[in-house]
């Protein structure tokens, strides 16, 4: 059987999506089903193409998306903590699970992505993977550049360089 990659184009996410703004809840439900996220980031200026925030700033745009994903993950963790805590009094494994869930939640509340959570071992990594957190998923950034920056792979584009630096610091790739 040949390998298949299916891309699902999901409408852009806006600030407040985790609270239902725009198509937020639908977007977050759709993205939860994917194995990896390809985040298209605007890295060009054109006065004919209006930016929702009024200016081009790819790091701000990445941060907006990441915060919405973090907020959604925190909500998922809060529900899981509430559900699991009920049985944790009589079950040491559930108590340990609650402890891990609370630690991940605290990590997210500091503005960190779940994938940067320091796992103790493979079992803990597998448990976190089973939570299907959005900020645990691998991310590839697609730098959307104008035609002038295609030949040099964006090397002369300062926006692309900022995205590359961010990606390198966050275990992600850019193309």
Spell out what each predicted region is:
Residues 51-52, 73, 152-153:
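A short, ordered amphipathic alpha-helix with a cationic face
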Residues 1-39, 43-66, 119-131, 156-159:
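Switch II of P-loop NTPase G domains
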Residues 83-175:
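C-terminal-of-GTPase-core extension/linker across diverse P-loop GTPases
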Residues 4-22, 30, 63-70, 74-107:
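Conserved ASCE/P-loop NTPase catalytic core
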Residues 6, 35-42, 58-84, 105-112, ...:
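Conserved beta-strand/loop subsegment of P-loop NTPase cores
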């Amino acid at each position: 059987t040949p390998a298949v990659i299916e891309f699902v184009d999901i409408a852009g996410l806006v600030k407040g999506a985790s609270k239902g703004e725009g198509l937020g809840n639908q977007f977050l439900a759709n993205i939860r089903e994917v194995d990896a996220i390809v985040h298209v980031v605007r890295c060009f200026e054109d006065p004919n193409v209006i930016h929702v925030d009024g200016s081009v700033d790819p790091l701000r745009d990445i941060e907006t998306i990441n915060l919405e994903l973090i907020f959604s993950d925190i909500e998922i963790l809060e529900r899981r903590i509430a559900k699991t805590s009920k049985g944790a009094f009589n079950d040491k494994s559930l108590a340990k699970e609650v402890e891990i869930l609370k630690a991940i939640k605290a990590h997210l509340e500091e503005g960190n992505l779940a994938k940067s959570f320091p796992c103790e071992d493979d079992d803990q990594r597998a448990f976190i993977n089973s939570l299907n957190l959005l900020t645990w998923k691998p991310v590839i950034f697609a730098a959307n550049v104008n035609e002038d920056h295609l030949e040099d792979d964006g090397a002369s584009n300062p926006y692309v360089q900022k995205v590359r630096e961010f990606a390198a610091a966050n275990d992600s790739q850019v193309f």
